[in-house]
From Swiss-Prot:
HAMAP family named in the record: UPF0208
Listed name of the protein: UPF0208 membrane protein HD_1715
Domain of life of the source: Bacteria
Keywords (A to Z) from UniProt: Cell inner membrane, Cell membrane, Membrane, Transmembrane, Transmembrane helix
Localization, UniProt: Cell inner membrane
Cysteines paired by S-S bonds: none
Transmembrane portions of the chain: 41-60, 66-88
Family under the similarity heading: Belongs to the UPF0208 family.
Source species of the chain: Haemophilus ducreyi (strain 35000HP / ATCC 700724)
Amino acid sequence: MRSIMINTIQLGQRYLETYPNQKKLALFMPDYRLIRLVKQAARFMPIFACFAILWQYFFTDPTQSILANAIITSLFAISLPYQGLYWLGKRANTPLPLSLLDWYQSLKQKLISEQKIMQDQAVPSYQDFANLLKLAEETWGDNYFNEL
């Protein structure tokens, strides 16, 4: 169970790094917004966790047992980026829906015609689609995404 969770988080990290940073993709999939939130959470949640503990420690009555609540809140705040990575890892292995499959096939045919890829994928997943979008970004730059 533990190794499955770690592998899923690693898949989410790979999906996060592969997915192109194009704002227009937010119109088609929620992944762009979630990836931005995960990156911001990874940056700011440790600071928030430290602040929550210090605030409760220094500014509350020491006779109250509020420090335990602050620690639980901090642990939850620190876990938020990992929850996002876990969701992205699950999403990366999910097969593409029919609504995105046509876009995947047309993009794949364009890249094959320019001899950028040769492989054939039986059941494309979101990770495969992110790989194609990243390759399209590297090949054509922002021009491809401006056409969307």
